[in-house]
């Protein structure tokens, strides 16, 4: 699933149907990095990559295209990946799993163009991380502190950067979640509900802004009621 307002449209077309043709169309009409799209010349440090994945997943889903460089004037360069830099996609996905919550949905796809492909894709190789958006689970938080990652941090995209969410950005995430629906889906397990509640408690304890703290308190109360419903104890009188 992806956020309905993903931009540019060529990216949305690619995400819904990730083929060689839609990738070419996206790259040939590239308008630069956005909240939903990132380019890398080569594979980068896994903690940095995990940070970008969390940010894109929280922002609505999207992709990271590996094999696209940047020229001195800021324009993109469709260099592709060398054989040495073209990694095993299963290995990439498995290693990333050590840095990401298990419910973040992502996958790596290979795009190999042969000598018959039109320029500038002739004999080029690209790899693309496709990152989905699931309103049941956002906001995704970092599960470890290592390298670029801080435990419990919520990352979002801001143009070409992946940064920690401000109070205002966190509110945007929640409003987008509500708009997409399923904010309190019964598909969540009890453990997932409890994990979300734990993160809400931690978020409340580290905030100094009164308005934001009151907002978190309201969300905590609703989450507590939802957990009581899952346990079938909602409305029971205390003894």
What feature does the model see in each segment?
Residues 48, 75, 137-140:
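Intrinsically disordered, low-complexity acidic/polar segments
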Residues 20-29, 92-96, 113-117, 142-143:
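Intrinsically disordered, low-complexity boundary segments flanking structured domains
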Residues 1-63, 68-72, 165-239:
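Bergerat-fold GHKL/Histidine-kinase-like ATPase
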Residues 103-196:
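Intrinsically disordered, low-complexity regulatory tails
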Residues 56-57, 98, 116-121:
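Short, charge-rich binding segments
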Residues 63-116:
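A broadly used, surface-exposed interaction patch
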Residues 47-50, 86-89, 123:
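Amphipathic alpha-helical transducer elements in NTP-driven molecular machines
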Residues 38-42, 75-82, 144-146:
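Short hinge/gating elements
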């Amino acid at each position: 699933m992806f956020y309905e307002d993903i931009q540019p449209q060529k990216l949305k077309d690619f995400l819904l149907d990730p083929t060689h043709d839609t990738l070419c169309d996206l790259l040939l009409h590239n308008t630069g990095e956005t909240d939903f799209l990132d380019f890398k010349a080569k594979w980068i440090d896994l903690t940095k990559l995990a940070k970008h994945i969390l940010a894109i997943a929280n922002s609505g889903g999207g992709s990271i295209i590996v094999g696209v460089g940047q020229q001195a004037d800021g324009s993109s360069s469709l260099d592709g990946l060398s054989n040495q830099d073209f990694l095993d996609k299963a290995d990439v996905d498995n290693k990333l799993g050590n840095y990401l919550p298990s419910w973040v949905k992502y996958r790596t796809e290979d795009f190999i163009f042969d000598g018959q492909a039109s320029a500038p894709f002739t004999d080029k190789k690209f790899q693309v991380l496709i990152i989905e958006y699931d309103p049941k689970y956002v906001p995704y938080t970092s599960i470890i502190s290592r390298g670029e990652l801080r435990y419990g941090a919520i990352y979002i995209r801001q143009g070409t950067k992946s940064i920690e969410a401000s109070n205002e950005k966190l509110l945007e995430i929640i409003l987008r979640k509500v708009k997409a629906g399923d904010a309190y889906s019964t598909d969540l397990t009890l453990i997932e509900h409890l994990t979300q509640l734990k993160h809400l408690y931690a978020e409340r304890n580290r905030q100094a802004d009164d308005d934001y703290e009151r907002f978190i308190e309201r969300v905590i109360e609703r989450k507590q009621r939802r957990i009581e419903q899952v346990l079938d104890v909602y409305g029971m009188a205390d003894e």
